[in-house]
Amino acid sequence: MITAVCILLFLGADLIRPPSVVPTDRGGVVVSAKGGDRRWTANWTMEQLERDGKKAIRFTERGQGHVSPYSEEVKWSLESVWSAENGLRPLESEKVVTTKTGKPLVTERKHFDLNNNTVRFERQFSDGRSETKSLSIPPDTLAVEGIAGILRFLGFDQNARLAAHVLSNEPRLYSVTFETRGMERVKTPAGQFEAYKVEMVPHMGVLSVFRSLFPKAYFWFTVAPPHFWVRYEGPENGPGTPDIVMELDRASE
């Protein structure tokens, strides 16, 4: 799966405040290279659920096409669960990738321990190889799985910035801020929308002078509530991967 940014709820770190009721939503996306060539399509869902008696959000995605780092067309299914108690924080995710004909290629899992601020990353290949890595993470860490659905809850009421860390699938942790860049009218396969443009700005410490060398990433969310995601421009799977344009193909069904 997916207004100026609101003043955030401070809970020891900047966290996005969940709504009292999470809307059930679903739709489709179409992804093209910057040159216009079609790369892949996907269907996604978002719903509220309970996890261990606490409020959570589940995102799913099923896609097919050409996506980095695979040289051939693949299929995948993804499920990601986020805590929605006090602030929105990732709990776990699983992504299963197969060939176009259904032959298993790789399974990726992330499990977040919110009490100890750690994440365990696992990658298992069909030939028996596996990779495991554990990282310490700040409380404001966001996972890429479901991030567009989470950012729609920024609020978009007042000028502000969201400072956070983003965990990629490398896996690597990036310090970023999400900054509003005004409003634009955006045309997508799902229609035309008045949308807020949000830039994801990387922070590189003493290397910030080289920020211009990093690929830019932008998200667009509708001005009209519930501020659903309509467009993304940026790297497909982190630095070094193809720049893409991802658009809403059809709105909620």
Question: Where is each model-derived feature located?
Answer:
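Bacterial Sec-dependent signal peptides at the C-terminal "C-region" and cleavage site
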Residues: 3-17
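Intrinsic disorder/low-complexity detector
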Residues: 4, 115-119, 129, 142
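Generic secretory/membrane-interface signal
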Residues: 8, 121, 134, 171-173
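Acidic, serine/threonine-rich low-complexity disordered tracts
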Residues: 13-116, 158-253
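Terminal leader/tail segments of proteins
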Residues: 121-123, 249
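Surface-exposed beta-loop interaction hotspot
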Residues: 124-158
